[in-house]
């Protein structure tokens, strides 16, 4: 991986990340393709209509079905899906924790039952790296010990202790495998934990950022805390993260969350919100959210967003999308998803331009002004 910090606008950063498969301009939003597919889209949509240079797939889900060994036999993620750009794979720890009826973390890893058939599995730091070697992602995440908030200080301290221990095991194993010729073109990120407690975040960030990772993520946020708590936690944590490596805020979030956290120095984001909300009838626009299922749009000839250049807005009216949604037509899900993801990715491109011109504060003010 080649990382270049090109410009800053106060704490906001414009960077370039070069992997074996693409050049990623930051700030970047990564569409979520949990199962190796961005819901409702094909890879032509992702490439040609969205211009996405990186998408996310999930280790837990790909491990359970179709199986990481199957993916490896089919040409790894790039060959299996035909997406030629970069993949980031989450370690699967969050899904093992949240989707399993029975999930137990110990000092050795996470035991869980499959949400598909109830079979028992055990993720260790080394196993999730082996799985991600089979998947062939450009950026892999380590196994971390996730804590649901609110949590006791004792439990958060244990989470940090385990995450640091697993990180040390992970980076040692990953670099050893690279010397053996396995995963030579892959990169690995660590995940900082600590809830919303600044002392815990300092401890976790300090311990992890001393290790030889290619980038660092902030995990354990957007799990029910107040927005200001999230923003304060991010602002504090980035102070302890290196300036010469990517910074990734996991699972976040709304357009407002992206704007606020770019200002605080975050480079990379992912979230299911634009795709999930599209399917549920909520569309994101330059002027705020639009609930397309509302009767007010039944005879509205305007595009979803007059400032948007996506295929959906160039060709179709709000009335047509309202009709498709109410009729539960499959075409709706594609058109709505194209719009929402285009909005997110374009917002990142505009943010980048503002940073390059050292006008991020003005860009942020205009973003909120349009929302009234």
From Swiss-Prot:
EC number(s) per entry: 2.4.2.29
Cofactor(s) essential for the protein: Zn(2+)
GO cellular component, one term: cytosol
Catalytic site: 90 (proton acceptor), 270 (nucleophile)
Top-level taxon in the UniProt lineage: Bacteria
Entry note: cofactor: Binds 1 zinc ion per subunit.
Binding site for substrate: 90-94, 144, 193, 220
Chemical reaction(s) catalysed: 7-aminomethyl-7-carbaguanine + guanosine(34) in tRNA = 7-aminomethyl-7-carbaguanosine(34) in tRNA + guanine
GO terms under biological process: queuosine biosynthetic process; tRNA-guanine transglycosylation
UniProt keywords, alphabetically: Glycosyltransferase, Metal-binding, Queuosine biosynthesis, Transferase, tRNA processing, Zinc
Molecular function (Gene Ontology), one example: metal ion binding
Keyword Zinc on entry: yes
Residues covered by region (RNA binding): 251-257, 275-279
Annotated metabolic or biological route of this protein: tRNA modification; tRNA-queuosine biosynthesis
Recorded family membership: Belongs to the queuine tRNA-ribosyltransferase family.
NCBIfam families per the UniProt record, alphabetical: Q_tRNA_tgt, tgt_general
The protein's assembly and partners: Homodimer. Within each dimer, one monomer is responsible for RNA recognition and catalysis, while the other monomer binds to the replacement base PreQ1.
Function, in words: Catalyzes the base-exchange of a guanine (G) residue with the queuine precursor 7-aminomethyl-7-deazaguanine (PreQ1) at position 34 (anticodon wobble position) in tRNAs with GU(N) anticodons (tRNA-Asp, -Asn, -His and -Tyr). Catalysis occurs through a double-displacement mechanism. The nucleophile active site attacks the C1' of nucleotide 34 to detach the guanine base from the RNA, forming a covalent enzyme-RNA intermediate. The proton acceptor active site deprotonates the incoming PreQ1, allowing a nucleophilic attack on the C1' of the ribose to form the product.
Protein name: Queuine tRNA-ribosyltransferase
Species of the source: Sulfurimonas denitrificans (strain ATCC 33889 / DSM 1251)
Source taxonomy: Bacteria, Pseudomonadati, Campylobacterota, Epsilonproteobacteria, Campylobacterales
């Amino acid at each position: 991986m080649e990382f270049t910090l090109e410009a800053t606008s106060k704490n906001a950063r414009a960077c370039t990340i070069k992997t074996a498969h693409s050049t990623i301009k930051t700030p970047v939003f990564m569409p979520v393709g949990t199962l190796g597919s961005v819901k409702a889209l094909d890879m032509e949509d992702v490439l040609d209509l969205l211009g996405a240079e990186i998408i996310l797939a999930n280790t837990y889900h790909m491990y359970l079905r179709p199986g990481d060994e199957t993916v490896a036999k089919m040409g790894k993620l790039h060959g299996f899906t035909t997406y030629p750009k970069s993949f980031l794979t989450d370690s699967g720890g969050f899904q093992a924790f949240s989707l399993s009826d029975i999930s137990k973390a110990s000092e050795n890893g996470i035991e869980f039952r499959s949400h598909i058939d109830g079979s028992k599995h055990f993720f260790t730091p080394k196993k999730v790296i082996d799985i991600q070697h089979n998947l062939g992602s450009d950026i892999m995440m380590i196994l971390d010990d996730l804590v649901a908030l609110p949590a006791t200080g004792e439990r958060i301290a244990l989470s940090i202790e385990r995450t640091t221990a697993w990180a040390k095991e992970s980076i040692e194993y990953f670099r050893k495998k690279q010397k053996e010729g396995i995963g030579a073109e892959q990169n690995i990120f660590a995940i900082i934990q600590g809830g919303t407690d600044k002392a815990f975040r300092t401890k976790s960030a300090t311990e992890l950022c001393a290790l030889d990772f290619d980038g660092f993520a902030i995990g354990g946020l957007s799990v029910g805390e107040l927005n200001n708590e999230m923003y304060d936690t991010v602002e504090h944590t980035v102070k302890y993260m290196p300036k010469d490596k990517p910074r990734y805020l996991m699972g976040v979030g709304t357009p407002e969350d992206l704007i606020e956290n770019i200002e605080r120095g975050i480079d990379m984001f992912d979230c299911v919100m634009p795709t999930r909300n599209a399917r549920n009838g909520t569309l994101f626009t330059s002027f705020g959210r639009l609930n397309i299922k509302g009767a007010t749009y039944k005879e509205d000839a305007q595009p979803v967003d007059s400032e948007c250049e996506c295929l959906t807005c160039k060709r179709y009216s709000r009335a047509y999308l309202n009709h498709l949604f109410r009729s539960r037509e499959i075409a709706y899900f594609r058109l709505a998803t194209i719009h929402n993801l285009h909005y997110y990715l374009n917002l990142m491109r505009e943010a980048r331009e503002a940073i390059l011109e050292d006008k991020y504060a003005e860009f942020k003010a205009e973003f909120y002004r349009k929302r009234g």
